[in-house]
Design a protein with these regions (language model features):
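Aromatic-lined, polymer-binding surfaces characteristic
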Residues: 1-109
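CBM-like carbohydrate-recognition segments
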Residues: 113-191
Protein backbone atom coordinates (compact mmCIF):
# COMPACT_ATOMS: atom_id res chain seq x y z
CA UNK A 1 0.00 0.00 0.00
CA UNK A 2 3.01 2.29 -0.37
CA UNK A 3 3.15 2.41 -4.15
CA UNK A 4 2.46 5.78 -5.75
CA UNK A 5 -0.80 6.26 -7.65
CA UNK A 6 0.83 6.02 -11.05
CA UNK A 7 0.76 4.25 -14.38
CA UNK A 8 2.28 0.96 -13.14
CA UNK A 9 -0.61 0.35 -10.76
CA UNK A 10 -3.20 1.29 -13.37
CA UNK A 11 -1.62 -1.09 -15.91
CA UNK A 12 -1.59 -3.85 -13.27
CA UNK A 13 -5.28 -3.38 -12.42
CA UNK A 14 -6.17 -3.13 -16.10
CA UNK A 15 -4.41 -6.46 -16.69
CA UNK A 16 -6.28 -8.13 -13.84
CA UNK A 17 -9.56 -6.75 -15.19
CA UNK A 18 -8.75 -7.95 -18.70
CA UNK A 19 -7.92 -11.46 -17.47
CA UNK A 20 -11.16 -11.56 -15.50
CA UNK A 21 -13.19 -10.45 -18.51
CA UNK A 22 -11.50 -12.85 -20.94
CA UNK A 23 -11.86 -15.85 -18.61
CA UNK A 24 -15.37 -14.83 -17.53
CA UNK A 25 -14.21 -14.79 -13.90
CA UNK A 26 -16.62 -12.46 -12.09
CA UNK A 27 -14.65 -12.63 -8.84
CA UNK A 28 -11.47 -11.50 -10.57
CA UNK A 29 -13.36 -8.69 -12.30
CA UNK A 30 -14.78 -7.55 -8.95
CA UNK A 31 -11.30 -7.77 -7.38
CA UNK A 32 -9.95 -5.51 -10.12
CA UNK A 33 -12.76 -2.94 -10.01
CA UNK A 34 -13.86 -2.63 -6.39
CA UNK A 35 -12.75 -4.98 -3.63
CA UNK A 36 -11.73 -4.49 0.00
CA UNK A 37 -9.07 -7.15 -0.65
CA UNK A 38 -7.44 -4.93 -3.30
CA UNK A 39 -6.21 -1.60 -1.91
CA UNK A 40 -5.41 -0.39 -5.43
CA UNK A 41 -8.54 -1.45 -7.32
CA UNK A 42 -9.79 0.64 -10.22
CA UNK A 43 -12.10 2.78 -8.11
CA UNK A 44 -9.28 3.49 -5.64
CA UNK A 45 -6.99 4.32 -8.54
CA UNK A 46 -9.51 6.77 -9.99
CA UNK A 47 -9.62 8.63 -6.69
CA UNK A 48 -5.85 8.37 -6.14
CA UNK A 49 -4.54 9.09 -9.64
CA UNK A 50 -6.84 12.03 -10.33
CA UNK A 51 -5.89 15.08 -8.31
CA UNK A 52 -8.28 17.71 -7.03
CA UNK A 53 -7.78 21.26 -5.77
CA UNK A 54 -5.94 21.14 -2.46
CA UNK A 55 -4.64 17.57 -2.80
CA UNK A 56 -1.17 16.85 -1.51
CA UNK A 57 1.24 16.35 -4.41
CA UNK A 58 3.67 13.45 -4.62
CA UNK A 59 6.57 13.79 -2.21
CA UNK A 60 8.95 13.49 -5.18
CA UNK A 61 7.87 16.85 -6.61
CA UNK A 62 10.25 19.75 -6.09
CA UNK A 63 9.55 22.03 -3.17
CA UNK A 64 7.65 25.12 -4.21
CA UNK A 65 6.00 23.49 -7.25
CA UNK A 66 2.59 24.77 -8.27
CA UNK A 67 -0.06 22.93 -6.25
CA UNK A 68 -2.16 20.37 -8.10
CA UNK A 69 -5.56 21.40 -9.40
CA UNK A 70 -8.73 19.52 -10.32
CA UNK A 71 -8.08 17.08 -13.14
CA UNK A 72 -4.32 16.81 -12.92
CA UNK A 73 -2.89 13.32 -12.61
CA UNK A 74 -0.60 12.09 -9.84
CA UNK A 75 2.07 11.08 -12.38
CA UNK A 76 2.74 14.78 -12.92
CA UNK A 77 5.70 14.32 -10.56
CA UNK A 78 7.57 12.80 -13.54
CA UNK A 79 8.16 16.40 -14.63
CA UNK A 80 10.69 16.55 -11.79
CA UNK A 81 11.95 12.96 -11.76
CA UNK A 82 11.77 12.11 -15.51
CA UNK A 83 12.92 14.80 -15.98
CA UNK A 84 10.49 16.80 -18.10
CA UNK A 85 8.20 13.83 -18.68
CA UNK A 86 5.17 14.98 -16.70
CA UNK A 87 2.82 15.37 -19.66
CA UNK A 88 4.02 12.10 -21.18
CA UNK A 89 3.30 10.11 -18.02
CA UNK A 90 0.04 11.86 -17.16
CA UNK A 91 -1.12 11.07 -20.70
CA UNK A 92 -0.10 7.43 -20.23
CA UNK A 93 -2.03 7.18 -16.97
CA UNK A 94 -5.09 8.84 -18.53
CA UNK A 95 -4.87 6.44 -21.48
CA UNK A 96 -4.69 3.41 -19.17
CA UNK A 97 -7.55 4.67 -16.97
CA UNK A 98 -9.65 5.40 -20.06
CA UNK A 99 -8.94 2.02 -21.64
CA UNK A 100 -9.93 0.39 -18.35
CA UNK A 101 -13.11 2.48 -18.26
CA UNK A 102 -13.85 1.51 -21.86
CA UNK A 103 -13.51 -2.21 -21.03
CA UNK A 104 -15.89 -1.71 -18.13
CA UNK A 105 -18.30 0.29 -20.30
CA UNK A 106 -18.36 -2.53 -22.84
CA UNK A 107 -19.34 -4.86 -20.00
CA UNK A 108 -22.11 -2.79 -18.43
CA UNK A 109 -20.26 -0.53 -15.96
CA UNK A 110 -19.90 3.13 -16.92
CA UNK A 111 -16.74 4.40 -15.22
CA UNK A 112 -16.77 7.45 -17.48
CA UNK A 113 -19.83 8.58 -15.50
CA UNK A 114 -18.37 7.46 -12.16
CA UNK A 115 -17.48 10.11 -9.63
CA UNK A 116 -15.41 8.99 -6.65
CA UNK A 117 -16.65 9.86 -3.15
CA UNK A 118 -14.01 12.61 -3.03
CA UNK A 119 -15.13 14.07 -6.38
CA UNK A 120 -12.68 12.67 -8.94
CA UNK A 121 -13.98 11.95 -12.45
CA UNK A 122 -12.17 11.13 -15.71
CA UNK A 123 -13.82 14.10 -17.41
CA UNK A 124 -11.71 16.50 -15.35
CA UNK A 125 -8.48 14.97 -16.68
CA UNK A 126 -9.58 15.12 -20.29
CA UNK A 127 -10.59 18.74 -19.86
CA UNK A 128 -7.50 19.82 -17.93
CA UNK A 129 -4.93 18.28 -20.27
CA UNK A 130 -6.75 18.95 -23.56
CA UNK A 131 -5.65 22.59 -23.46
CA UNK A 132 -1.97 21.56 -23.50
CA UNK A 133 -2.42 19.50 -26.66
CA UNK A 134 -4.61 22.13 -28.34
CA UNK A 135 -2.07 24.89 -27.73
CA UNK A 136 1.01 22.63 -27.93
CA UNK A 137 2.39 24.73 -25.08
CA UNK A 138 3.57 23.08 -21.86
CA UNK A 139 3.83 26.41 -20.02
CA UNK A 140 0.11 27.21 -19.83
CA UNK A 141 -2.03 27.10 -16.70
CA UNK A 142 0.19 26.96 -13.58
CA UNK A 143 3.41 26.60 -15.58
CA UNK A 144 4.23 23.36 -13.74
CA UNK A 145 5.00 21.45 -16.97
CA UNK A 146 7.08 24.25 -18.51
CA UNK A 147 9.99 22.91 -20.54
CA UNK A 148 8.10 19.94 -21.99
CA UNK A 149 6.76 21.50 -25.20
CA UNK A 150 9.47 19.94 -27.40
CA UNK A 151 8.60 16.43 -26.13
CA UNK A 152 4.84 16.73 -26.57
CA UNK A 153 3.34 14.02 -28.83
CA UNK A 154 6.74 12.39 -29.41
CA UNK A 155 6.56 9.66 -26.76
CA UNK A 156 3.14 8.09 -27.28
CA UNK A 157 1.16 11.00 -25.85
CA UNK A 158 -0.97 11.34 -28.95
CA UNK A 159 -3.87 13.81 -28.82
CA UNK A 160 -5.98 11.29 -30.75
CA UNK A 161 -6.80 9.70 -27.40
CA UNK A 162 -9.02 12.70 -26.72
CA UNK A 163 -11.45 11.32 -29.30
CA UNK A 164 -12.43 8.86 -26.57
CA UNK A 165 -12.93 11.74 -24.18
CA UNK A 166 -15.22 13.47 -26.66
CA UNK A 167 -17.21 10.27 -27.13
CA UNK A 168 -18.08 10.09 -23.44
CA UNK A 169 -18.18 13.83 -22.72
CA UNK A 170 -19.69 15.26 -25.94
CA UNK A 171 -20.75 18.47 -24.18
CA UNK A 172 -17.20 19.27 -23.02
CA UNK A 173 -16.06 22.50 -24.63
CA UNK A 174 -12.30 22.04 -23.87
CA UNK A 175 -12.25 18.56 -25.41
CA UNK A 176 -14.28 19.71 -28.41
CA UNK A 177 -11.91 22.65 -28.92
CA UNK A 178 -8.93 20.28 -29.06
CA UNK A 179 -10.61 17.86 -31.45
CA UNK A 180 -11.69 20.69 -33.77
CA UNK A 181 -8.44 22.66 -33.48
CA UNK A 182 -6.61 21.05 -36.38
CA UNK A 183 -3.62 20.49 -34.07
CA UNK A 184 -3.48 16.85 -35.13
CA UNK A 185 -4.69 14.77 -38.06
CA UNK A 186 -7.85 13.01 -36.91
CA UNK A 187 -7.62 10.46 -39.72
CA UNK A 188 -4.10 9.26 -38.94
CA UNK A 189 -4.00 9.91 -35.22
CA UNK A 190 -4.56 6.92 -33.00
CA UNK A 191 -4.85 6.24 -29.33
Amino acid sequence: NKQYYQNHLVAHSMGILMLGLVTDDDELVQFAIDSPANPRDVKELLSGCILMDGDTPCSREKAGSAPPVKGEIYDRYRHDTGPLKGLQYTHLTLTLLSTTARMCYNNGLDLFAYTAPTGENLRYCFEYYSDFYRSMDSCIKSGYYCGETERMTKAGDNPGMYEMGLRYYPDSEPIRQLINSGTFNRESSYM
